[in-house]
Swiss-Prot record:
It comes from the Eukaryota. It is found in: Cytoplasm; Nucleus. The keyword Magnesium applies. Pfam families: Inositol_P. Substrate binds at residues 73, 94-97, 231. This is Inositol monophosphatase 1. Keywords: Cytoplasm, Hydrolase, Lithium, Magnesium, Metal-binding, Nucleus. One of its GO terms (molecular function) is metal ion binding.
Amino acid sequence: MTIDLASIEKFLCELATEKVGPIIKSKSGTQKDYDLKTGSRSVDIVTAIDKQVEKLIWESVKTQYPTFKFIGEESYVKGETVITDDPTFIIDPIDGTTNFVHDFPFSCTSLGLTVNKEPVVGVIYNPHINLLVSASKGNGMRVNNKDYDYKSKLESMGSLILNKSVVALQPGSAREGKNFQTKMATYEKLLSCDYGFVHGFRNLGSSAMTMAYIAMGYLDSYWDGGCYSWDVCAGWCILKEVGGRVVGANPGEWSIDVDNRTYLAVRGTINNESDEQTKYITDFWNCVDGHLKYD
C-alpha cells in the first residue's frame, strides 16, 4: 500500500488549525476542575477538554483514514495499547496541559503518524501564538505552511557543543523516587563547571513544542524521561527532516523505538556533521547521573 504522506500532513495541518486549535485557545485557563491521572503525589493533569479534543481528532481521522489505527493519550490503556507496523495515528490532543490549565500560552496539539513504527508525519500547532510546525518523511519541514530555511538558522547557531548549548529539560509529573533523583543529579552535572557547563536550561512545559523549537534552531537539545509516544511522535518526524537525531536518555541507547519512554533529542548541524552530533550525545551522556527507567 502506497501512502501519500504529504496529503496526510496537509490534512492534519487543517485539522489542527481549523478544528482543534480554536478549542484549545478559547478554553485555555477555564478548566479549574481537573483530574490527576496517577494519584495525589503526581501533578499529571487531565481536563475534560483533553478528552473532548481527542474525540474530535479520532472521529476526523477515522472518517478520512478508516483503516489506520489510532493511539491517543486519553484513550491509552497501559498493557493493552501497543504500536504495530500498521499505519497508526499517535496524537496528544493537548500537549502542555499544565500550561493550558494555568493559561500559559504554550499548549499545543501534537498529531503524528507512524508506519512500521517509524514517525513519518508530524504536525504541531500552538494556537496561542499561531505557530504551525509540520513535516512528512522525505518532504522537509514547514512553518505556517511555508518551507523553513533551517540551514541558515543552523549556520547562525554555529557548532553543536555541549558547553555552548541551551538544553531543554522537564522534571515531569512524578516528584519522588529514583527517576526523579536521577533527573535532579543530572541537572546539577549539566550545569556544573566541572561537567557539562551548559549555557542554560529551558522548560517549555510541552515535549512537542520543545522538539519543534529544536527543529527550528532555537534550542540545542532536549533530555527527558517519562514521556510517551504521543509526546514525541510528531516532533520526532519534524526533527529528523531537518537533520536532527533522537536517541535514548540513558548512555548507550543509540537506537530506540518511539515508545521508549526516555529520550535525548538533538538539533541538526551545519553540513549534517553526524560526528559532531555523536560527540555531543556522548558528552551529554557523561553527565547522566543514574539510570532512567519507566514501566
